[in-house]
Every structure is written in structure tokens, then in C-alpha cells.
């Protein structure tokens, strides 16, 4: 059995403080855990994962895994030594992301673009809403 919890109240997390994100994610996982017996929690958000995993792992006895930017495989697979990272501004600026780059991609040129708007457009697309191509072009123009 799987339970999917989405925080549509505080979404997106990319512009929120680390303290807010940790408190919010711990609060949500606690609420779910009180209603359902959890064997594992997956934090399926780069921003939330990069800041909340230590607190979650300390609080809960079940395993907690997260998703983080795929720097390691991207660095291994790039043909030209350039890796692009599209993420929230929070993920782009967090020390955890820099540590991934230093550890796994120090020979690569990493081009990062942080945008809350991309998150909102991706979620809109998942809900079947149209995503204007011109809007994507505007957001990606700095790249």
C-alpha cells in the first residue's frame, strides 16, 4: 500500500526558509504516521530532501529516503562536460547541492537555473492544464 501526501498549502518550498521546510515536512510525516503505519517514507522533493532528511531520520524509526539533484549520473553521462540543473532557487543555492557538485562533478561545468515558476508550471501540467511555450521560453531565457 502507498500513501501520497502533497502539501498544497505551502507549495512550492523553494522560496521558504530551511526552518519552515523542516518543521512543515516533519509535521506532515508525523500526521500521516499517526493515521497509518508507515514502513518507509519517501520525500519526493529536492528542496525538502536537501534540508529535512536529517531531522526526519532522527525522529522516526522507519527509513526515510529523499530525492536530490541527479548530479552524479549526469556528470557520468555528459558527453561535453556540461551539466544543466533546473530546480527551485532553494535547491540551487543550498550547500547540499554544492557538496554533490564538488563530490561527483568537480570536472564538469554545472549550469544551474533556479525557478519557482518552473515548479508551478510542472504541477499545472500534471493536473492537465496547458503550459504556454512562450512562458517556458521566458523562464529559460537566462540559460
Q: What annotation goes with each model-predicted range?
A:
Residues 1-143:
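Non-catalytic structural scaffold of enzyme domains
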Amino acid at each position: 500500500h502507498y500513501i501520497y501526501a502533497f502539501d498544497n498549502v505551502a507549495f512550492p518550498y523553494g522560496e521558504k526558509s530551511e526552518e519552515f521546510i523542516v518543521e512543515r515536512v516533519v509535521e506532515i510525516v508525523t500526521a500521516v504516521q499517526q493515521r497509518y503505519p508507515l514502513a518507509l517514507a519517501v520525500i519526493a522533493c529536492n528542496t525538502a530532501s536537501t534540508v529535512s532528511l536529517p531531522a526526519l531520520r532522527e525522529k522516526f524509526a522507519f527509513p526515510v529516503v529523499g530525492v536530490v539533484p541527479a548530479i552524479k549520473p549526469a556528470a557520468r553521462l555528459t558527453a561535453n562536460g556540461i551539466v544543466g540543473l533546473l530546480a527551485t532557487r532553494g535547491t540551487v543555492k543550498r550547500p547540499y547541492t554544492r557538496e554533490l557538485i564538488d563530490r561527483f562533478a568537480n570536472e564538469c561545468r554545472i549550469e544551474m537555473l533556479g525557478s519557482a515558476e518552473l515548479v508551478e508550471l510542472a504541477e499545472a501540467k500534471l493536473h492537465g492544464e496547458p503550459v504556454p511555450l512562450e512562458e517556458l521560453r521566458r523562464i529559460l531565457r537566462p540559460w
